Amino acid sequence: PLYPASVKPIKGRVILVEGIFDMVNLFDKGLSNAICCFGTNNVNEDKLSILKMQDIMGVDIIFDGDDAGQKAAENVRFLAERVGLITRNVNLGQNIDPGSLAEQQVKNLKEKLYD
C-alpha cells in the first residue's frame, strides 16, 4: 500500500518516497504531503490510481540518488503518467537519501517544489 492512505496535497501534489523513515523525516520537518511506497517494487498502476481518485494531480518522486533509486523513479514515473498523474523526478544527488535530510534542506526543498 501507499502510506498514509490519505494525505493533504500541497498545490495538488504529493511526494512519493521509498521508505517509512524517508516519509517520517520529510513530514516531521514540514513536508506534510509525503507518502511512502514501502520499496520501489510495491508500486503499480492500481495503487497510483487511488491518488487520482483523491483528486491528487501530481506526484513528486523522491527516491534515493543512487543508480538503482533513479531507475526505480523512472519506472514509477512511467506508471504514474499512465494513470494521468503529472510527475516530477526530484533527484537529490548521488548517495543522498530523503530520510537523512536536515531541517533546512527540507525547507529548501519545499520552497523549490511549491513556491
Outline where the language-model segments fall.
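Short secondary-structure boundary/capping segments
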Residues: 30-32, 76-78, 105
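Short, aromatic/basic amphipathic alpha-helical patches
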Residues: 71-81
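C-terminal or mid-to-C-terminal helical accessory/interaction module adjacent to the motor/catalytic core
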Residues: 89-97, 101-115
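Acidic beta-strand-to-loop metal/phosphate-binding motif
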Residues: 16, 54-68, 90-91
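Phosphate-handling DNA/RNA-contact segment within nucleic-acid enzymes
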Residues: 1-55, 72-73
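Short acidic, glycine/proline-enriched helix-loop-strand junctions
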Residues: 82-87
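Acidic, metal-coordinating catalytic cores used for nucleic-acid/nucleotide bond scission
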Residues: 40-44, 63-73, 94-97
